[in-house]
Amino acid sequence: MIRFILFISCFFLIGMVIECKDGYLMEPNGCKRGCLTRPARYCPNECSRLKGKDGYCYLWLACYCYNMPESAPVWERATNRCGKGK
């Protein structure tokens, strides 16, 4: 029983340490990467190219990716610069 508790504790500890981020892919101009007119596999392929686990076209408007590395640029409301120039 103690081994089981230790195993579960280690499992949760590893899960807390290894965190990945989710988010919308971002264009160089700071806007979300659109997917309305793209092929069906566009978003999952782009997410994989950036080392994400998976992705999809959210409401046919923008690519959303799961488990992206911390270094991958994703759109964030707090740092939004879309349409604001450089």
UniProtKB/Swiss-Prot annotation:
The lineage of its organism: Eukaryota, Metazoa, Ecdysozoa, Arthropoda, Chelicerata. PROSITE patterns: LCN_CSAB. It comes from the Eukaryota. GO terms for cellular component: extracellular region. CDD domains: neurotoxins_LC_scorpion. Disulfide bonds join 31-82, 35-57, 43-63, 47-65. Residues 1-20 form the signal peptide. This is Toxin Td1. Residues 21-83 form the LCN-type CS-alpha/beta domain. It holds the Pfam family Toxin_3. The keyword Secreted applies. Expressed by the venom gland.
